[in-house]
UniProtKB/Swiss-Prot annotation:
Motif 'HIGH' region, residue range(s) on this chain: 48-58
Coiled coil stretches, renumbered: none
NCBIfam families the record matches: leuS_bact
Intracellular or extracellular location(s): Cytoplasm
Listed GO biological process terms: leucyl-tRNA aminoacylation
Motif ('KMSKS' region): 645-649
EC number: 6.1.1.4
Protein name: Leucine--tRNA ligase
UniProt cross-references to InterPro entries, sorted A to Z: aa-tRNA-synth_I_CS, aa-tRNA-synth_Ia, Leu-tRNA-ligase, Leu_tRNA-synth_edit, M/V/L/I-tRNA-synth_anticd-bd, Methionyl/Leucyl_tRNA_Synth, Rossmann-like_a/b/a_fold, tRNAsynth_Ia_anticodon-bd
Source organism of the structure: Polynucleobacter asymbioticus (strain DSM 18221 / CIP 109841 / QLW-P1DMWA-1)
Amino acid sequence: MSKDYDHRGIEAAAQADWERTQVYRVTENAVNASGKKKPKYYACSMLPYPSGKLHMGHVRNYTINDVMARQLRMQGYNVLMPMGWDAFGMPAENAAIQNKVPPAKWTYDNIAYMKKQMAAMGLAIDWSREVATCSPDYYRWNQWLFLKMLEKGVAYRKTQVVNWDPIDQTVLANEQVIDGRGWRSGALVEKREIPGYYFNITAYAEQLLSGLDGLGWPERVKTMQQNWIGKSRGVRFAFKHEIADAHGNFIQDGLLYVFTTRADTIMGVTFCAVAAEHPLASKAAENNPTLAAFIEKCKTGSVIEADLATQEKEGMFTGLYVTHPLTNESVPVWVGNYVLMSYGDGAVMGVPAHDERDFAFALKYELPIKQVIALKDESPMFNGTHWQDWYAQKENVVCFNSGKFDGLSHEEAVNTVASDLEKMGIGELKTTYRLRDWGISRQRYWGTPIPIIHCGDEGNPGCGAVPVPEADLPVVLPEDCVPDGSGNPLNKRADFLNVKCPQCGKPARRETDTMDTFVDSSWYFMRYTGPDATSMVDGRNEYWMPMDQYIGGIEHAILHLLYARFWTKVMRDLDLITFDEPFQNLLTQGMVLNETYYSEEASGKKTWLNPLDVELDLDEKGRPQGAKLKGDSSGTPVIIGGVEKMSKSKNNGVDPQALIDQYGADTARLFVMFAAPPEQQLEWSGAGVDGASRFLRRVWMYSSSQASAIKDAQDALPSTLNDAEKELRREVHAILKQANFDYQRRQYNTVVSAAMKMLNVLEPIKLGQDSPISASVLRECLSILLRVLYPVVPHLTHVLWKDMGYSENFGSLLDAPWPTVDETALIQTEITLMLQINGKLRGELKVPADASKEQIEAIALQSEPATKALNGGAPKKVIVVPGRLINIVA
């Protein structure tokens, strides 16, 4: 075999072997060589969007998954590692508009290219289970389950104020609005009333909350979901009024309902605020154009609580009053831009003395501030300059200035207030959730068609919204549409749009809204288990699910992970599956970072420069003092921007394909595993990549130099080992023990460190007549090194394993047994201690491993450095540090 490390030839040969033998194709209920059923292990990365090319975040994610899958398979597990494509969504439509091609063509072309990139990475993917969510064979089951959910009332249609993205021309779920802007377009979100379909995820709020307890997920992710679900215990009650509508009927039966977690502050209410869409606001605006204009202004912007919390609080008095239920005082009603109609009853009570938002609102509009709770054992006098002291805490406050509730603790007051209001028939204790139902209707083309047919029109209601019969599924999306940016192209496709009503047979129209793409990603991992199933899932799903290990970015903590958990529980309730949670364990890999550089124009406009185009000026210690563009003679100033996440916007990404072409996939894999633990951020380093390449070259050159002797050696160890062989095996098996521990902890960076230590131990050994190490012992040690390295660098190790003759006895490296630590090899008969005289190192001392303190002292005192220093005299003191050193004080 060649001693030159040719990564292209090596990786091509390995991949050809894997393709020819289809080694990554797995089946259910696999057995080992002895006929015993293997334990299953399902390890899966979050499926990618086929954007065109892989980025380094993909490389890191999939390499982590691959390392895990390969090592577990060698340990005897039946491992499933599938891959698919989250193929619907707006980017494909935008690309289609820009390139004047159908989104389908753009998507499938990207899938083909990215699949080649994954093959080049050497990933152990079972491609027989590949899924693309834009395939009718897949999304028909989105439609089928939608109809089942419709039957059960889990899916329903309603008109509601929603987040509207004016650029993408579609509704956004709350989770898809970030800082008041659309998560894809970045446009400022508007409020609109629009009909659409919703999933009743709020009915599962308590299950979604309690189910987190048993999951092996990062606490940070659990906390994010807990906060998003937002369980609150409080009191829902009503302020009475006699405000009538145009027909003379009291609006909402004369009751303005609010919910509060701080019913102990009810006596401090000085105003109520309602949402712009509230019936009382509409009534007040009928003859008040100024208020009407303010209401319209409020209807622009996000309907996200987090966004409302940071925007300036604005309001306008309606001229209306409601009656306080306990004091009978008149309470003014205001329209507030911070009140959501979709949250609770669309109204809140205002207690300025004990709520930061209400306090700011009251100061701005000169509303009364009434203190009604006080800190225990302190002066109850409210001071407006120290309002923070009176904000709502629960543990150390009592009611004050609250009549019959004076002196009651928070909990006592809440229960008493709730009881009084319940007796009056206008209040009750209630548990609420911040979580809102999931709106799935999107006014876009490239998505799963919602299987509904609309019969009738405004003049003739007809049959209304009629579900598509199950036999007519899937409702196939025409793939030849080329969007032009002027709305949903499905509205222009008569062949899709026009259909007969399934109930009455009269002309009708298909629903042209498509489903939120998070529907697609809510169950794809189950379809992997049986992509050819004639039902949504089959028995294979019960074998593989729930998933043992899920891997993906923490940015999906709320959106995808919450929806997937909800979807799983719905499928359980429909008796399609028997498990409650989809993902038993979750690993959230850290981001990949790189340096950023930019040039800045006089106007302040920044042009981001790729790090490969920048040359650094370094001082004598290698620290950057400045930067310049390579080959730039004009002296354009280059500013060092610091280390940030790799992104297109900062132009600081590294092309994985270029990296593989130059160094090989094994080098790329080794670097991303060695540079940082999986959960931590990884800072890109060109020097680190070079170092990874040098290490692999050393492995190849050393192994190939010893290959001929090792290939002919026996697998069985000699019956008697010499001291050098014992010491070599002790070192190698000690390193193996640490590597096994690190593999178990998923600390792959220290696994690579262990392999490097092992190579350092082996490299000095050159088999030959003068070598104290036999070929059989080195054969064992090298087999351990190759197996420890294999999950991380599968190409090089696969070829070496084969060329050095290991496969003849152990079979393919993928299915070779994981090396077992020989505990007897770790037993030392002799250890080496540092010998010090008067605290200065004077040599080494070999002593029996089980020697007592007295025996060690005796051996040390007989050593040449000791006898010379003592010159026949006795030592003043002898200090023994077990396992490390002995110090003789002369």
